[in-house]
């Protein structure tokens, strides 16, 4: 079949979902380290966010693709593997990335002085103290900021940025500059444990010099593969690249054959298709649409022991790469989404921690969730159905109810409690009781 220059919005959605690994059944067995490795490699990064009203974001993104898995296995893979394959870096924001990406992101460490001046000013304000922190780590090995004395020699809490101690601000700045790297997370607050970068990142990667343009092209290759299809602004946003710079290098990727210019129904901006994306999407098309066929017997299982046939469905973290660019998901899915954590309660439209629900190839609903660990239940504070999903209201409700049960079991909660708020609450509650 010859390449097409005009794509429907449905085609674009399928391509995007396939690129994100959301077009296929979850493993029937419990996901393992190899599955987690493939997810991170496919996405290029996992954004770290420890808002724990439900589960930290870096754990939920694999869950959306793999179903229930042992969260400790992700920590082991990232921080405690015999040969380090992944590390934390400022990629999009603080992220888990394949360690091989270090040379591509290295040039950006010098730019952090401008982006995060509130932190790096501590290195200029306390140069001798900053040197002493590095020397302390050199002598004692990997440390948490809480194990370091403050500037005045005390171990008390002195006010820094966001109320952090000055020691933590200095360690954060050293991390942003690439002078220290994260070896582990520890304690109830998941504190970073940092060592000298030269003892964490392999020498071959540290010594590899990548010119800025080559690094940007490398990051854009990762972004375009992870998106499958998109605009320059979509691709630039993936690793927080400058749009003007990205524009030039996207043109070079088109010339090199990595991307192809296409037109997408309803898009005003020029769209670009990754060279491998259309074929990958075609292989998952019947699964996305929920049609029967050779893949129709596939099932998705969670730790609850319940399995359900296709169509595919998944709750998505607010920090999932599929939805973190709000303009992109509005264009792709006609889904108006904003995370309202920082919005005063009285002004929130949907809720505090609202997750989009993917059903087949559309974002069909949204739910405000809270893991109530004291009560042992997953609370659905509010639930809303998207207008386009009304004809499939019952099907969406049953798929979402099953996904909520799977998530609750994965989080070690005994059940799901569905609140009355929202236009989908009654239907969802009935489906959960079936």
Label each region the model flagged.
Residues 1-291, 300-328, 332-354, 359-434:
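Long, low-complexity intrinsically disordered regions
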């Amino acid at each position: 079949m010859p390449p097409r220059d005009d794509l429907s919005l449905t085609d674009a959605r399928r391509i995007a979902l396939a690129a994100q690994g959301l077009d296929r059944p979850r493993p029937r067995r419990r996901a393992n380290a190899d599955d987690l490795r493939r997810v991170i490699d496919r996405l290029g990064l996992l954004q770290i966010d420890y808002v724990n009203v439900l589960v930290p974001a870096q754990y939920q993104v694999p869950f959306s693709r793999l179903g229930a898995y042992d969260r400790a296995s992700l920590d082991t893979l990232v921080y405690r593997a015999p040969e380090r394959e992944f590390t934390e870096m400022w990629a999009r924001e603080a992220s888990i990335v394949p360690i091989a990406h270090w040379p591509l992101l290295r040039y950006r460490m010098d730019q952090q002085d401008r982006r995060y001046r509130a932190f790096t000013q501590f290195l200029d304000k306390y140069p001798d103290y900053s040197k002493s922190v590095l020397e302390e780590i050199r002598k004692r090995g990997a440390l948490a900021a809480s194990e370091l004395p403050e500037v005045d020699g005390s171990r008390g809490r002195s006010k820094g940025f966001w109320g952090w101690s000055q020691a933590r601000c200095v360690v954060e700045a050293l991390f942003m500059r690439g002078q220290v790297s994260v070896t582990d997370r520890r304690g109830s607050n998941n504190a970073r444990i940092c060592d000298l970068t030269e003892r964490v990142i392999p020498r071959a990667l540290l010594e590899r010099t990548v010119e800025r343009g080559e690094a940007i092209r490398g990051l854009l290759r990762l972004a375009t593969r992870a998106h499958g299809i998109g605009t320059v602004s979509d691709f630039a946003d993936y690793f927080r690249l400058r749009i003007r710079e990205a524009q030039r290098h996207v043109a070079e990727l088109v010339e090199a054959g990595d991307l192809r210019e296409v037109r997408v129904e309803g898009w005003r901006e020029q769209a670009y298709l990754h060279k491998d994306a259309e074929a990958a999407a075609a292989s998952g098309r019947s699964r996305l649409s929920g049609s029967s066929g050779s893949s129709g017997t596939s099932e998705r299982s969670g730790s609850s022991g319940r399995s359900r046939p296709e169509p595919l469905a998944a709750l998505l973290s607010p920090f999932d790469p599929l939805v973190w660019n709000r303009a992109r998901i509005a264009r792709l899915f006609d889904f108006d989404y904003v995370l309202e954590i920082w919005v005063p309660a009285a002004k929130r439209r949907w809720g505090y921690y609202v997750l989009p629900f993917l059903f087949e190839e559309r974002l069909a609903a949204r739910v405000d969730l809270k893991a109530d660990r004291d009560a042992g239940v997953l609370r659905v504070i509010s639930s809303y159905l998207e207008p386009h999903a009304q004809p499939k209201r019952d099907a969406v409700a049953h798929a979402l109810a099953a996904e909520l049960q799977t998530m609750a079991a994965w989080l070690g909660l005994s059940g799901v409690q569905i609140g009355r708020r929202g236009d989908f609450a009654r239907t969802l509650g009935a489906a959960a009781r079936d």
